């Protein structure tokens, strides 16, 4: 009954590239990882009907041409989970509502009512899903047929590798998106990046060197920086010509220092994403200049006259307090029972309101910093040559620390090296994932233009 639909043949962009046969090792790693994830989902009650070595929900299995069991029990569970999420969202809206209730205690009562409804429907839905998974057999549901699904996995991986021209991280993102019924471009998302990190990392660590050769592992090509054709600056366009010259000068200093070389087109792609080549760009949290350097990072690198008033650190302290209050508000919400409901609900709303107050104060301080920084021309981050020189040196160091892995160096630049270590790969933050995707998109655009010159 295996019949792949046209979705498997659609490219993400451009014509599909050739790819090597899918290695058995990669398939084995995904199978092991998916089976472990399924077991975890049953234990922590995040299971939503995903079955087999592909972890397909029945709707997706059917789309991919498999015979699946769905039935009323599963459909009822899905409906209950949807209603439970709506009830939870109602509770959260009341927690965040700044308006005064018309009657004392009204907000707490509404929170209790919505959350207990959420809890009741979630418990009922999870019980139905346990019944559902116990009822499945390989004879009635091809998601449980290892041979059929292993063949399908190879086909999906092969298609993903062709669509991404052998870029392994992106191919893994496309693969898991297809298995989850997600249509996403770029392929790597905050939702799937943990899967990508785990499978990519294990495959690269376990595979013999020859098995890795056909794949693009996001590695820096050390020869590119020193072997660019004379007209390479034309690839970035006339609007960035001056910035390209500054990058070229900064690369010369790196070469004299013995630092790891950086493809100037990669770094220009980073600048384009960070500041759109605007030398006076300032982010909402105070990163400044072409390369969007934070005050503390600038000082650590030895930049002088960095505008770094005391209240700037106060803004970050407020940010931490805001997040802490929000976490505590959610914890209070999820501790609600029929017995303690009103007390916990009132506390949850109080904490959420405090989080929102801290957020407003934080935004006020950051706005003040942006205004004042624009009046500080001596800040070297706003001087194009200094921003490029120090930003390039910093990025070069990150590339060295990440052993030439461009994706991890970009993630480190955006979220900090400690976050890359924490998640053993690209952190699952929306901003960081989008940053990595966009820089590499610009980089590939420049390389394509270079090939056409």
Task: Name each model feature, range by range.
Residues 11, 17-21:
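Boundary at the C-terminal end of the N-terminal hydrophobic targeting segment
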């Amino acid at each position: 009954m295996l019949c792949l639909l046209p979705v498997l043949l659609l490219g993400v962009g451009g014509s599909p590239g050739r790819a090597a046969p899918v290695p058995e090792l990669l398939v084995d790693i995904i199978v092991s990882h998916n089976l472990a994830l399924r077991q975890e989902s049953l234990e922590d009650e995040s299971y939503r009907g995903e079955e087999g070595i592909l972890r397909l929900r029945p709707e997706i299995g059917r789309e991919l041409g498999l015979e699946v069991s769905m039935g009323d029990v599963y459909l009822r569970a899905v409906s209950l989970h949807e209603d439970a999420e709506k009830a939870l969202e109602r509770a959260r809206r009341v927690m965040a509502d700044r308006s005064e209730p018309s009657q004392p205690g009204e907000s707490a009562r509404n929170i209790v009512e919505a959350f207990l409804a959420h809890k009741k429907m979630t418990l009922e839905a999870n019980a139905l899903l346990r019944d559902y998974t116990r009822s499945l057999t390989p004879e009635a549901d091809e998601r449980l047929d290892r041979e059929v699904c292993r063949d399908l996995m190879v086909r999906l991986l092969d298609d993903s590798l062709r669509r991404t021209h052998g870029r392994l991280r992106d191919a893994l993102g496309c693969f898991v998106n297809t298995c989850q019924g997600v249509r996403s471009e770029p392929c790597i998302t905050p939702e799937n990046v943990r899967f990508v990190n785990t499978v990519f990392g294990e495959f690269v660590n376990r595979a013999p060197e020859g098995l890795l050769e056909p794949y693009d592992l996001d590695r820096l090509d050390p020869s590119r920086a020193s072997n660019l054709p004379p007209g390479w600056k034309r690839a970035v366009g006339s609007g960035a010509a001056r910035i390209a010259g500054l990058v070229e000068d900064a690369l010369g200093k790196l070469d004299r220092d013995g630092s790891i070389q950086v493809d100037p087109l990669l770094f220009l792609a980073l600048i384009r994403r960070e500041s759109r080549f605007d030398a006076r760009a300032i982010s909402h949290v105070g990163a400044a200049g072409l390369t969007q350097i934070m005050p503390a990072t600038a000082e650590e690198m030895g930049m002088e006259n960095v505008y770094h008033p005391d209240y700037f650190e106060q803004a970050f302290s407020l940010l931490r307090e805001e997040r802490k209050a929000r976490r505590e508000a959610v914890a209070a919400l999820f501790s609600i029972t029929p017995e303690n409901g009103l007390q916990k609900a009132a506390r949850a709303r109080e904490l959420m309101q405090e989080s929102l107050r801290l957020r407003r104060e934080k935004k006020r301080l950051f706005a003040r910093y942006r205004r004042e920084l624009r009046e500080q021309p001596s800040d070297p981050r706003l001087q194009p040559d200094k921003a490029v020189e120090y930003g390039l040196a910093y990025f070069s160091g990150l590339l060295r620390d990440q052993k030439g892995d461009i994706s991890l160096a970009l993630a480190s630049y955006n979220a900090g090296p400690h976050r890359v270590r924490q998640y053993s790969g690209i952190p699952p933050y929306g901003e960081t994932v989008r940053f990595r995707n966009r820089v590499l998109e610009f980089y590939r655009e420049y390389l394509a233009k270079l090939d056409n010159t």
